[in-house]
């Protein structure tokens, strides 16, 4: 993602005033910006494109994480749990690897950055403080 430059930036309305949003916009001053109420309709519309993942990767979506950022690593029965946790600060990838299972697995085809980073890290710190005897692998 070293040289990534989006063709368009979408910002959910409740994410537009965060410092990270302003920083990202300052990095791409010439890129068109569209403020949206929420990303559900945007994502649904993108899925109707002949190449939803490829076309959406050219856009950047800025939004707030709504409390899902720290969670157990997804697993399925009958596999043993690895006891890992994931911390989501972003979703997606700008690469086009044809073998990538994530292109079919992810429900959001856009490159997405969660801009409420301070809140995410505060929530993580609270979880760690509330569980001092638990070992977390993140």
Task: Give short role names for the model-derived ranges.
Residues 10, 34-35, 86, 98, ...:
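A structural signal for short, well-ordered beta-strand segments and their strand-loop junctions
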Residues 88-105:
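Local cysteine-cluster metal-coordination motifs and their immediate loop/turn environment
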Residues 1-83:
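Flexible, acidic/Gly-rich N-terminal and inter-domain linker regions that tether
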Residues 63-79, 102-138:
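Conserved Radical SAM active-site core
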Residues 39-42, 84-91, 117-119:
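Short, glycine/charge-rich beta-strand/loop segments that flank catalytic centers
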């Amino acid at each position: 993602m070293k040289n990534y430059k989006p063709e368009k930036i979408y910002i959910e309305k409740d994410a537009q005033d965060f410092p990270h949003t302003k920083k990202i916009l300052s990095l791409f001053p010439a890129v068109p910006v569209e403020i949206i109420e929420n990303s559900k309709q945007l994502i649904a519309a993108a899925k109707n494109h002949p190449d939803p993942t490829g076309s959406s990767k050219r856009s950047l979506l800025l939004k707030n994480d709504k409390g899902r950022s720290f969670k157990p690593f997804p697993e399925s029965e009958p596999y043993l749990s690895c006891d890992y946790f994931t911390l989501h600060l972003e979703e997606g990838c700008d690469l086009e690897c044809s073998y990538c299972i994530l292109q079919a697995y992810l429900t959001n085809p856009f490159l997405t950055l969660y801009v409420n980073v301070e809140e995410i890290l505060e929530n993580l710190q609270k979880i760690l403080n509330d569980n001092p005897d638990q070992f977390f692998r993140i």
